[in-house]
Amino acid sequence: MIKKKVLLLYAHPSQHRSEVNQPLFKAASKIKGVTAVDLYGEYPTFNIDIVKEQQQLLEHDVVIFQFPLFWYSTPAILKEWQDLVLEYGFAYGDGADALKYKLFLCALSVGDKEVLIRQMAIFTLR
């Protein structure tokens, strides 16, 4: 059992083609203590509820972004979420300590073979 409250924010625009992220998200969703949020499912029109999302951040100890890496970046919904929710005065700036002592992790996947990734020198895989 997980003692810390975990917020898993999942962003995959093509879930029907996901071979890695979707199964991981479904498995994590079943773990007690994990709040799993499918951002594309929750906000199909990108109309993100900033107050709700900030409240969720306050209520959790660990925040995980789960997404496939596209062109060295996050999917659009996650970028929009970051831009809106992690605003000045809440996530950073004078007196902003809402995220202080929170653990942040990224669980990301890439869609190419390890050999190709090594050749492109994007990552060093061991």
Where are the regions a protein language model picked out?
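N-terminal beta1-alpha1 ligand-phosphate binding loop
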Residues: M1-V34
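Structural signal for conserved beta-strand scaffold positions within catalytic alpha/beta enzyme cores
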Residues: L8, A36-D38, C106
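Short glycine-centered, acidic/aromatic-flanked micro-motifs in structured strand/loop junctions
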Residues: Y10-P13, L39-G41, F67
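A short, flexible beta-alpha/helix-coil linker loop
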Residues: P13, E42, G111-V115
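Glycine-/small-residue-rich active-site loops that bind phosphorylated ligands and cofactors
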Residues: Q15-H16, T45, F70-S73
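Generic recognition of short, well-ordered alpha-helical segments
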Residues: E19-P23, I48, A76-E80
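A short beta-strand-loop structural module common to alpha/beta enzyme folds
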Residues: G33-F46
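Helix-loop-strand module that forms the ligand-binding subsite of alpha/beta enzymes
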Residues: K52-R126
